[in-house]
């Protein structure tokens, strides 16, 4: 494949918190088109007026998320003063202790509360006063300007930049931070997002930046992040922040083959499957769910080894034309990161991946400038290959490299890969130029000649895309049975 410098991953993957807040303020602004489908439309062919700004029908009436109006301060200026006066020095001393006394724990408890509860103080996230020079006035209903990212950084520095902190003190402090964070899950949306991002960033060690070794995540934080994912009342912007942490924990903390790790990754995957099976959620959320399922590396329902629930759900997303290109392509990429065995009929899955490429080629020809086509096609390409720009050495819990070329016999996957490779190579060699009629006809002929007669992954599986996937009950962190998620309510 010709060499080319590309940015793997959509803007979503490198999204800022402010963009997540925009999702809270304009929940429908990212819709691919007014009907919510990915089919080519007349406007795709004709182009939108001036090809500038957002297409007609994309901007819709919306209201600011009510979660942005919540004010529930759990800490005061007086509490800050009291901590600095009475507990700051004992807190710093306690972090040096290798055997924590009751007084040490009391000091660390106070320190954890100081660092966590301050996130709820309005002064750290309220709108700044208007500038007098240009008389700028904050836009009514706009999300508050935040300074909470500084609190996140400073809290992490408490353990990362403290050369004298002991392992036992670090673990106890992180445990208390995680525990107290649960008290913020019904606070202002900005507060929730920041505390959830923090949980995914908590470092169990300092890593070795010089050698490219990232700090290990604090794995127990995943239970709080999963609590947000399972809560149907949580805003999707908060859930996306939770997924960011789960991605890091799965990638850096749970990837090694180990029974305990396998159990946690399965618990995470089973919580994500019913969320991805829903169709009424934002495409950005769906994209991140698929990405996290790929990193979790679980194929089967741990309660039923004959049910490849994760693979089935991802394959259904790939085949679903009502979903966004990014979600569908990321689902294909995630499939290449699952452990696959010879009990699975992968023929219909591979067929749907090529069919997705064909769908995109048709839509690309309708309007080559309309979407992030290069990103979509390269994400689809990564279903077969490991990502070089962010080295992927092996799938979670396994030894093989990511990608369907590594997972399946060459005779089963090589021809499929070549079909996708041709589509991607066209964008590399001819950016902005349409596929020729001969190219499209060739893909169409291949699809007609390779249409599978059996569209089931296993004998007991539903046909891909035929009906809703039977999702398992999410497994709670406490191990107790939980009630199944209620039917989703469509956004008004």
Task: Locate each region found by the language model.
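N-terminal acidic, proline/glycine-rich, low-complexity intrinsically disordered segments
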Residues: 2-4, 31-35
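Bacterial N-terminal signal peptides
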Residues: 13-28
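N-terminal secretory signal peptides that target proteins for export/translocation
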Residues: 1-12
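Extended repeat-based scaffolds of very large eukaryotic assembly and lipid-transport proteins
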Residues: 34-290, 301-309, 325, 347-354, ...
């Amino acid at each position: 494949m010709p060499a080319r410098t590309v940015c793997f991953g959509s803007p979503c993957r490198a999204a800022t918190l402010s963009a997540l807040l925009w999702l809270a303020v304009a929940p429908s602004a990212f819709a691919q088109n007014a009907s919510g489908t990915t089919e080519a439309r007349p406007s795709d062919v004709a182009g939108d007026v001036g090809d500038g700004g957002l297409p007609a029908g994309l901007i819709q009436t919306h209201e600011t998320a009510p979660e942005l109006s919540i004010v529930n301060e759990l800490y005061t200026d007086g509490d800050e003063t009291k901590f600095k006066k009475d507990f700051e020095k004992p807190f710093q001393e306690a972090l040096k202790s290798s055997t924590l006394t009751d007084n040490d724990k009391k000091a660390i408890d106070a320190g954890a509360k100081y660092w966590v509860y301050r996130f709820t103080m309005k002064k750290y996230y309220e709108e700044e006063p208007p500038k007098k020079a240009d008389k700028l006035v904050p836009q009514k209903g706009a999300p508050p300007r935040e300074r909470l990212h500084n609190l996140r950084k400073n809290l992490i520095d408490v353990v990362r930049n403290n050369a004298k902190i002991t392992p036992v003190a670090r673990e106890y402090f992180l445990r208390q931070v995680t525990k107290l964070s649960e008290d913020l899950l019904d606070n202002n949306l900005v507060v929730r997002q920041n505390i959830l991002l923090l949980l995914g960033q908590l470092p169990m060690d300092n890593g070795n930046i010089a050698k490219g070794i990232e700090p290990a995540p604090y794995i127990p934080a995943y239970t709080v992040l999963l609590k947000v994912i399972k809560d149907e009342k949580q805003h999707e912007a908060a859930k996306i922040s939770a997924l960011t942490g789960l991605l890091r924990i799965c990638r850096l903390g749970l990837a090694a083959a180990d029974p305990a790790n396998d159990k946690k990754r399965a618990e995470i995957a089973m919580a994500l499957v019913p969320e991805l099976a829903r169709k009424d959620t934002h495409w950005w959320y769906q994209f991140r769910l698929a990405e996290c399922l790929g990193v979790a590396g679980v194929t089967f329902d741990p309660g039923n080894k004959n049910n490849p629930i994760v693979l089935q759900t991802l394959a259904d997303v790939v085949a679903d034309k009502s979903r966004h290109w990014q979600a569908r392509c990321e689902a294909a990429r995630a499939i290449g990161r699952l452990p696959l065995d010879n009990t699975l009929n992968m023929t219909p899955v591979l067929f749907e991946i090529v069919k997705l490429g064909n769908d995109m080629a048709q839509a690309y020809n309708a309007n080559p400038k309309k979407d992030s086509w290069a990103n979509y096609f390269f994400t689809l390409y990564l279903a077969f290959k490991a990502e070089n720009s962010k080295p992927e050495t092996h799938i979670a819990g396994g030894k093989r490299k990511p990608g369907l070329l590594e997972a399946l016999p060459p005779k089963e996957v090589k021809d499929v890969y070549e079909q996708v490779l041709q589509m991607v190579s066209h964008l590399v060699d001819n950016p902005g130029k349409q596929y020729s009629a001969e190219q499209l006809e060739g893909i169409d002929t291949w699809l007609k000649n390779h249409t599978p007669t059996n569209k089931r992954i296993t004998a007991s599986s539903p046909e891909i895309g035929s009906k809703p996937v039977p999702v398992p009950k999410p497994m709670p962190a406490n191990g107790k049975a939980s009630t199944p998620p209620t039917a989703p309510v469509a956004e008004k």
